[in-house]
């Protein structure tokens, strides 16, 4: 029983350490990656480039990625600086 509890505890600790995030990819200008005129596989390729698991073009406007590492910058409304200069 002790081994089982230890195993479950380790499982939760590993789950907390290996967290990934989902979100819109952001370019150097602070704007989301535009995919309106790109081929269908563009977003999946861009997400793979930053070590994401998968991605797609959300509503034909911006690339949305799944399971990216924490170091990848993603767009959020609170930190949006797209179109505001540098």
Curated annotation (Swiss-Prot):
**Where is this protein found?**
Secreted
Q: List the disulfide bonds.
A: 31-82, 35-57, 43-63, 47-65
Record PTM Arginine amide, positions in chain: 84
Q: In which tissues is it expressed?
A: Expressed by the venom gland.
For molecular function, the Gene Ontology terms on record are: sodium channel inhibitor activity; toxin activity
Establish whether keyword Disulfide bond is in the entry: yes
Signal peptide residues are: 1-20
Q: Which domain of life is it from?
A: Eukaryota
Q: Name one GO cellular component term.
A: extracellular region
- Annotated ranges, domain LCN-type CS-alpha/beta: 21-83
Its keywords, alphabetically, are: Amidation, Disulfide bond, Ion channel impairing toxin, Neurotoxin, Secreted, Signal, Toxin, Voltage-gated sodium channel impairing toxin
GO BP term, example: defense response
The family database entries (Gene3D superfamilies) matched by this protein are listed as:
Knottin, scorpion toxin-like
Q: Principal place where this protein is found? A: secreted
Q: Which family does it belong to?
A: Belongs to the long (4 C-C) scorpion toxin superfamily. Sodium channel inhibitor family. Beta subfamily.
Q: What information about domains appears in the record's comments? A: Has the structural arrangement of an alpha-helix connected to antiparallel beta-sheets by disulfide bonds (CS-alpha/beta).
- What is the protein's given name? Toxin To3
Source organism per entry reads Tityus obscurus (Amazonian scorpion)
């Amino acid at each position: 029983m002790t081994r089982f509890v230890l195993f479950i505890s380790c499982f939760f600790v590993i789950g907390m350490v290996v967290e990934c995030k989902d979100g819109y990819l952001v370019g150097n200008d602070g704007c989301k990656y535009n995919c309106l005129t790109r081929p269908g596989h563009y977003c999946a390729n861009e997400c793979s480039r930053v070590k994401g698991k998968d991605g797609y073009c959300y509503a034909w406007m911006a690339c949305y990625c799944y399971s990216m590492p924490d170091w990848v910058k993603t767009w959020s409304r609170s930190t949006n600086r797209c179109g505001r200069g540098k």
